[in-house]
A protein has these predicted regions:
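Short pre-active-site segment immediately N-terminal to the catalytic Zn-binding motif
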Residues: 1-8
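Active-site recognition of the HExxH zinc-binding catalytic motif
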Residues: 8-20, 228
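Charge-rich, well-structured scaffold segments of protease-associated domains
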Residues: 21, 25-177, 220-222, 231-232, ...
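His/Glu-based metal-binding/catalytic segments typifying zinc-dependent metallopeptidases
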Residues: 172-240
Length: 300
């Protein structure tokens, strides 16, 4: 029941350090097996992945082993801070990231999705070994993990490999994770924001905050499928509406529309590059106002 303060960006920091193994780097070990590896942290999860055409079972074991073992020192944590701060500064100078993340952050008053995943250089510099260990022990437990494998594999053989791997390990009792309910207002935090940067073409994203949070997984799937289908019908490269907007100069090939839905937040993003960003904004608003009256051609 104890509340613990953790600096912003800890999940991303931990992702960086998870590749440190006792005898080297996990990415190098994957390369020795003929595989490429990567990882990413979003507002809701951290994922570790590999891609390979050979040694599939060995790669799965390596994935399990390095994710289920934390090898950090005070020195290695301090060294990583400079690397992460450079990454943060790189994203701060990236106009595509600035408009994308700004469009999301401006929707929310309190929800942590408005906080940059990497944190700030200040929060990174206030992150220490004991904090990373606490987060690892709390969240990196098999009960809070999912393994997803796709490929030309023998499922029964691979499941046997996984069970044997896990049976060799001792895991601490699962920590009950209590997620505090966030009282997020229904209004958006910032209606409009214009930043000035050196860009070849202006960038605009219209974001829509969805306040109805669905609890039923089936309802969530239905809503996600419905909106993704709508966007595919309207804005795929072969759709009549997309090509009409393209021909009239309302949009260019950078235009996109997407729907994101997580446990306790959901939003829509629509936008792209356009010198006349007010024209693009007007086009998107008009689409939103009349989407219920939209007629979809059969060949779309």
């Amino acid at each position: 029941g104890e509340e613990v303060y953790i600096p912003d960006g800890v999940a991303h920091f931990l992702e960086h350090k998870m590749f440190d193994m006792e005898n080297g780097d996990a990415a190098d070990e994957f390369a020795k097996l003929g595989a490429s590896s990567n990882a990413f942290t979003s507002s809701s999860r951290t994922a570790y992945l590999f891609s390979t055409t050979t040694n599939e079972n060995d790669c799965v074991e390596l994935l399990l082993d390095f994710v289920q073992s934390l090898n950090i020192t005070d020195e290695s944590v301090e060294k990583e801070k400079g690397i992460i701060c450079q990454e943060i500064k790189m994203y701060d100078d990236d106009p595509d990231w600035r408009v994308y993340f700004g469009a999301i952050a401006n929707l929310y008053h309190k929800h942590p999705v408005k906080i940059d995943i990497a944190g700030t250089c200040e929060t990174v510099n206030n992150t220490y070994k004991d904090m990373l260990e606490l987060c690892y022990q709390t969240f990196y437990h098999p009960h809070n993990m999912m393994l997803f494998v796709v490929g030309n594999i023998n499922p029964e053989e691979l499941i046997g490999v996984i069970k044997e791997n896990q049976n060799k390990k001792h895991f601490l009792s699962e920590n009950a994770i209590q997620r505090l309910k966030i009282e997020e207002p229904t209004s958006v935090a910032v209606k409009e924001q214009i930043d000035t940067m050196q860009v070849e073409m202006n960038k605009l994203i219209v974001s829509i905050k969805i306040n109805e949070i669905l609890d039923d997984p089936q309802d969530k799937i239905k809503r996600e499928l419905a909106l993704n289908l709508l966007f595919d019908l309207c804005f795929s490269k072969s759709s009549s509406l997309y090509n009409e907007w393209l021909e009239k100069g309302y949009i260019n090939e950078t235009f996109s529309a997407s729907f994101t839905q997580e446990r306790d937040y959901a939003f829509i993003l629509m936008g792209g590059d356009q010198d006349d960003y007010e024209l693009l904004q007007k086009t998107i608003f008009n689409f939103i106002d009349h989407v219920q009256d939209l007629e979809i051609a059969e060949d779309d």
